[in-house]
């Protein structure tokens, strides 16, 4: 095991320079698979945030003085550097977040690159329009950068979700202060270095690491921040929204989920159960859109439970660095305690624990894939986001019953529908309260389609052209022709 003096020290990245935190404090970053220290990370302060905001504000003019086509080329160079350093980025993400290296190589890093390339293509396509109002005036609109953006990034997909915020903001001409999650900062810091190498001017992309209660709160309160974008828990999202109200910052929130996966009796059960297992056990269930509620029609309920349990037992839990591993650890000891606490809650509420529900090994935050049967809609394990590999299988009687149960939580991020009846799947998709509905598939996202929810799942959308609106302000211009 490395001692603290052996660990690499990661400073803040502000205005193109690596800076020690003003407090001089560093925290130990932990590998969740081994519980061993892997790095020392700067603990930023409110003063460090202020320095970063001033750097970002000054860099706005520099970034917007660069022709849009050249900004696009810079972002494409960054995408190329990410691709050239894919192995390094994947190794950092796997080490820091406990994610299986095979999944990170296949999805996380390529998806982040795809997002950046997509928005690089937007740089010279952010247009206003001429709006005919009266014959003696030329009236038109412009879209201008919203300004300085604070992006607060979660720990479950650090680089991928970080890029959902960074790429469109940069394409729109904004500058950023990125606050990665305290426990998964490494890929954000490396991205900041690659951005400078690609030609992103100093101050355009700043990385300030540290605690949410310090760095996050300072970003929320700072009057120099024009826009906040956050992915995380509803409780933190509420606090951010309340804090941002003090100076009327624009806010986008992507919060929790308790997504329902509806399996009707005419569904292809092989495909449905395979996708249901992936939908809850992928990334150890630490996914906002995880299909944690599996709603099965009474005619196929027992078969769905049996098949799902078999798939849960077949999941290869273990070392994230091993190519055959399909599920790694939970992110932290605290998250493991939360998940195991919900297992006990489910049992005490009367649900049937079919498989899993225990810690794996003595080192690392591993928990067996877990399946509960005979779950009632009102139970806490059916209503509350667990953020772990815990599936609740709920029985329904008919289409109306399924929709009632699916819509019966505070969340509305995503849902899945499995049926061979074309009329049914369209009816159910229409009636489900969800930002995304998958039909006879589950879990896909793409930067070209909007992503987000409502209620405790947040508000606003990321991805696609909607994100361009998130990071720009419209301006109306009147020119009197006859003057």
Model-predicted segments: where are they?
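Rossmann-like NAD(P) dinucleotide-binding subdomain of oxidoreductase/dehydrogenase enzymes
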Residues: 127-271, 396
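Terminal low-complexity tails and localization/encapsulation signals of metabolic enzymes
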Residues: 1-40, 73, 77, 126-152, ...
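Conserved C-terminal structural/oligomerization subdomain of aldehyde/semialdehyde dehydrogenase
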Residues: 36-40, 225, 262, 316, ...
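Residue-level signal for inorganic ion chemistry
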Residues: 35, 71, 93, 116, ...
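Glycine-rich loop-to-alpha-helix module at the N-terminal edge of alpha/beta enzyme cores
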Residues: 36-126
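Structural signal for hydrophobic packing residues in well-ordered secondary-structure cores
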Residues: 60, 64, 79-86, 90, ...
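ALDH superfamily catalytic-core signature
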Residues: 235-376, 439
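Short, well-ordered beta-strand elements within core beta-sheets of diverse protein domains
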Residues: 37-44, 59-65, 151, 261-264, ...
């Amino acid at each position: 095991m490395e001692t603290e003096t052996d660990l690499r020290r990661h400073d803040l990245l502000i205005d193109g320079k690596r800076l020690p935190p003003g407090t001089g404090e560093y925290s130990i970053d932990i590998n969740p698979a081994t519980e061993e220290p892997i790095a020392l990370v700067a603990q930023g302060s409110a003063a460090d945030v202020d320095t970063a905001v001033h750097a970002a504000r000054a860099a706005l003019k520099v970034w917007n003085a660069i022709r849009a086509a050249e900004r696009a080329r810079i972002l494409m160079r960054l995408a190329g550097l990410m691709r050239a350093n894919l192995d390094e980025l994947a190794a950092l993400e796997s080490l820091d977040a406990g994610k299986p290296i095979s999944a990170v190589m296949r999805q996380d890093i390529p998806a982040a690159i795809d997002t950046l390339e997509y928005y690089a293509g937007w740089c010279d396509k952010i247009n206003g329009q001429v709006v005919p109002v009266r014959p003696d005036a030329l009236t038109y609109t412009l879209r201008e950068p919203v300004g300085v953006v604070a992006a607060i990034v979660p720990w479950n997909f650090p680089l991928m979700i970080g890029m959902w915020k960074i790429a469109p903001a940069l394409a729109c001409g904004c500058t950023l202060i990125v606050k990665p999650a305290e426990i998964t900062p490494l890929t954000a810091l490396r991205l900041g270095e690659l951005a400078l190498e690609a030609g992103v001017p100093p101050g355009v992309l700043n990385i300030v690491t540290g605690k949410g209660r310090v760095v996050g709160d300072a970003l929320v309160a700072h009057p120099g921040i024009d826009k906040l974008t956050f992915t995380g828990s509803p409780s933190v999202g509420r606090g951010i929204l309340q804090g941002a109200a003090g100076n009327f910052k624009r806010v986008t929130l992507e919060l929790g989920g308790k997504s329902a996966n509806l399996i009707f009796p005419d569904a292809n059960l092989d495909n449905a159960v395979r996708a249901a297992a992936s939908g809850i056990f992928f990334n150890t269930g630490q996914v906002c859109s995880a299909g944690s509620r599996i709603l099965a029609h009474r005619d196929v309920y027992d078969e769905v439970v049996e098949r799902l349990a078999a798939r849960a037992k077949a999941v290869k839990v273990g070392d994230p660095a091993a190519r055959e591993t399909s599920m790694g650890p939970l992110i932290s000891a605290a998250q493991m305690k939360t998940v195991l606490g919900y297992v006990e809650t489910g049992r005490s509420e009367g649900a049937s624990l079919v498989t899993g529900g225990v810690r794996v090994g003595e080192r690392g935050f591993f928990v067996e894939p877990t399946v509960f049967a005979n779950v009632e809609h009102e139970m806490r394990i059916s209503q509350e986001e667990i953020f772990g590999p815990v599936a609740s299988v709920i029985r329904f009687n008919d289409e109306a019953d399924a929709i009632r149960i699916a819509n019966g939580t505070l969340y509305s991020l995503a849902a899945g529908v499995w049926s061979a009846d074309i009329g049914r799947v369209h009816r159910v998709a229409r009636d489900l309260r969800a930002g995304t509905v998958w039909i006879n598939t589950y879990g896909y996202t793409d930067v070209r389609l909007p992503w987000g929810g409502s209620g405790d799942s947040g508000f606003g959308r990321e991805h696609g052209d909607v994100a361009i609106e998130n990071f720009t302000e419209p301006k109306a211009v009147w020119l009197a022709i006859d003057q």
